[in-house]
Amino acid sequence: CTTGPCCRQCKLKPAGTTCWKTSLTSHYCTGKSCDCPLYPG
């Protein structure tokens, strides 16, 4: 992976890493994709 909220320095962030957070909920990286599940961007 090269870009995305779940990518850092061309590597996937670990599963469970917060990729998007609001005052009501958080979404987490899966460790298998550079995209954030349900990320609104």
Swiss-Prot record:
Gene3D superfamilies documented for this protein: Disintegrin domain
Similarity section: Belongs to the disintegrin family. Short disintegrin subfamily.
A GO molecular-function annotation: toxin activity
Subunit structure: Monomer.
Motif Cell attachment site: chain residues: 21-23
Keyword Electron transport applies: no
Gene Ontology biological-process entries: angiogenesis; cell differentiation
Classification via InterPro entries: Disintegrin_dom, Disintegrin_dom_sf
Lineage: Eukaryota, Metazoa, Chordata, Craniata, Vertebrata
UniProt source species: Macrovipera lebetina obtusa
Keyword Secreted found: yes
Keywords: Angiogenesis, Cell adhesion impairing toxin, Developmental protein, Differentiation, Disulfide bond, Secreted, Toxin
Disulfide cysteine pairs (residue numbers): 1-10, 6-29, 7-34, 19-36
Site (Indirectly maintains the active conformation of the loop): 22
Anything else known: Negative results: does not show inhibitory activity toward alpha-2/beta-1 (ITGA2/ITGB1), alpha-IIb/beta-3 (ITGA2B/ITGB3), alpha-V/beta-3 (ITGAV/ITGB3), alpha-4/beta-1 (ITGA4/ITGB1), alpha-5/beta-1 (ITGA5/ITGB1), alpha-6/beta-1 (ITGA6/ITGB1), and alpha-9/beta-1 (ITGA9/ITGB1), alpha-4/beta-7 (ITGA4/ITGB7) integrins.
Function: Is a potent and selective inhibitor of alpha-1/beta-1 (ITGA1/ITGB1) integrin. It blocks the adhesion of alpha-1/beta-1-expressing K562 cells to immobilized collagens IV and I with IC(50) of 2 and 0.5 nM, respectively. Potently inhibits angiogenesis in chicken and in mouse model and reduces tumor development by half. Is 25-fold less potent than viperistatin.
Protein name: Disintegrin obtustatin
Compartments (UniProt record): Secreted
Predominant localisation class: secreted
Ranges for domain Disintegrin: 1-41
Tissue: Expressed by the venom gland.
A cellular component term, taken from the record's GO annotations: extracellular region
Highest taxon listed in the record's lineage: Eukaryota
